[in-house]
């Protein structure tokens, strides 16, 4: 069974951003989240990534790097592995296979036993990740479901990630992706800011990802989203 099969909640930490004053990575690990993912779209460097991975890796919680480019890859025993984005609706093929090829070409230390992919479906045209990947975000529920099905059954993806990055998404679109998947785990990220938004999205997605909230509002707010996700999962099960 994959590490993420039982995750309800992930905190994503952007190494290019700071935590709320007075809070630590230990505080983040203690929110009740199931895992920490470390990554961001812009401003990523090996030095920034290493600082956050080393700090988070001291605590008893799974830590995964989500590399946005080869420069942000850190080889360390302080993390559990890599979750590498493959952007299904990217207009620039760099973010489907190009960056991945380049990483493999220049890095002879990749541990394939700890390296996995996430099939991203980017939905917010205003988000940095949409601009960065030239993603076509003009998608309806049928489009998203088709991308999700292609990811699982054509490309063998174990994780499908519906990403609204910075805005709360349409639950019906997330539900369409959830309904079409057989075994792949559905991640959802974007705009989760309180108990209710977490509970709503966790009723459809297997795992919700909370990012900006930890940097903007802090661990108390994150803790509420953990509760929302756990309550939704308990109801669904």
Swiss-Prot record:
Where located?
Cytoplasm
Any single Pfam family the record assigns to this protein: PcrB
List cofactor names only.
Answer: Mg(2+)
Similarity-based family: Belongs to the GGGP/HepGP synthase family. Group I subfamily.
Q: Which GO terms describe its molecular function?
A: magnesium ion binding; phosphoglycerol geranylgeranyltransferase activity
* Reactions listed under catalytic activity: sn-glycerol 1-phosphate + (2E,6E,10E)-geranylgeranyl diphosphate = sn-3-O-(geranylgeranyl)glycerol 1-phosphate + diphosphate
Tell me the InterPro entries matching this sequence. GGGP/HepGP_synthase_I, GGGP/HepGP_synthase_sf, GGGP_HepGP_synthase, GGGPS_halobacteria
Task: Write out the pathway annotation from the protein's UniProt entry.
Answer: Membrane lipid metabolism; glycerophospholipid metabolism
- So what EC number does this one have? 2.5.1.41
Residues bound to Mg(2+) are 14, 41
- Give GO cellular component annotations, separated by semicolons: cytoplasm
Q: Which UniProt keywords apply?
A: Cytoplasm, Lipid biosynthesis, Lipid metabolism, Magnesium, Metal-binding, Phospholipid biosynthesis, Phospholipid metabolism, Transferase
Binding locations of sn-glycerol 1-phosphate: 12, 161-166, 191, 211-212
Q: What does this protein do?
A: Prenyltransferase that catalyzes the transfer of the geranylgeranyl moiety of geranylgeranyl diphosphate (GGPP) to the C3 hydroxyl of sn-glycerol-1-phosphate (G1P). This reaction is the first ether-bond-formation step in the biosynthesis of archaeal membrane lipids.
Top enzyme class: transferase
Q: Please name the GO terms of the biological process aspect recorded for this protein, alphabetically.
A: glycerophospholipid biosynthetic process
Recorded hits in CDD domains, A to Z, give:
PcrB_like
Lineage, opening ranks: Archaea, Methanobacteriati, Methanobacteriota, Stenosarchaea group, Halobacteria
Q: What is the name attached to this protein's record?
A: Geranylgeranylglyceryl phosphate synthase
């Amino acid at each position: 069974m994959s590490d993420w099969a039982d995750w309800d909640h992930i905190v994503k930490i952007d190494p290019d951003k700071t935590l709320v004053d007075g809070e630590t990575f230990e505080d983040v690990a203690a929110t009740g989240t199931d895992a920490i993912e470390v990554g961001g779209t812009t401003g990523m460097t090996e030095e920034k990534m290493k600082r956050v991975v080393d700090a988070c890796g001291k605590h008893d919680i799974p830590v995964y790097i989500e590399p946005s480019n080869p420069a942000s890859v850190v080889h360390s025993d302080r993390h559990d592995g890599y979750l590498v984005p493959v952007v299904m609706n990217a207009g620039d093929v760099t973010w489907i296979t190009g960056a991945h090829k380049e990483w493999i070409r220049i890095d002879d230390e990749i541990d394939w036993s700890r390296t996995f992919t996430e099939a991203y479906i980017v939905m917010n045209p205003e988000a940095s990740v949409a601009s960065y990947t030239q993603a076509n975000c003009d998608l309806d529920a049928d489009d998203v479901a088709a991308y999700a099905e292609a990811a699982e059954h054509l490309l063998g993806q174990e994780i499908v990630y519906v990403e609204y990055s910075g805005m709360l998404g349409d639950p019906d679109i997330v539900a369409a992706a959830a309904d079409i998947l057989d075994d792949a785990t559905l991640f959802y990220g974007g705009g989760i800011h309180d108990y209710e938004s977490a509970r709503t999205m966790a009723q459809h997605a297997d795992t919700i990802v909370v990012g900006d909230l930890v940097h903007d509002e802090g661990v108390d707010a994150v803790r509420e989203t953990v509760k929302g996700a756990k309550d939704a999962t308990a109801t669904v099960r």
